[in-house]
Amino acid sequence: ESVSVGELYNATSHPQEYCLALNIYYESRGDNLAGKAAVSDVVMNRVSSTAYPNTICEVVYQARWKESWKTKQYPDLDDSERVYIPIRHRCQFSWFCDGKSDEPPIGDEWRQAQTIAYRMVNSDYLIGIADGATHYHATYVNPKWNKDMLLIGRIGLHIFYVQR
């Protein structure tokens, strides 16, 4: 798979960085650099925790799944041919199960997300900026789950937490 013009790398050449870049792009597009890095740091904190999956892609795509109606209607279909999709509102990161395309448009925001992801995976660049946070939400929402969390603080357009 070749790298598209305007992309620094693709999902084949750098899969973990690509997953992280997608999450940065869809979760913090329009935020400042610190906000994007903090969103990325939450993923890295989860990878380091025994409570979450062990890779960036597994953390980003952690969800509850259901079989697609397209394959569910065929009882004799081999398991390897069945299609599963994430259940809406049952993903760790909302963009992954919103039903929209997960292909980012090529542009400055995507290139910045790819740069941040690459640097955070391959160096100590801004690692720790979220101060150990494993959860966050946008400033304009107030989810029920945050009542059970310890507030870390606000960075950019998100509020960060760690489990008590």
Language-model features, listed with the residues they occupy:
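Bacterial extracytoplasmic/cell-wall-associated proteins, especially those involved in peptidoglycan
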Residues: 2-164
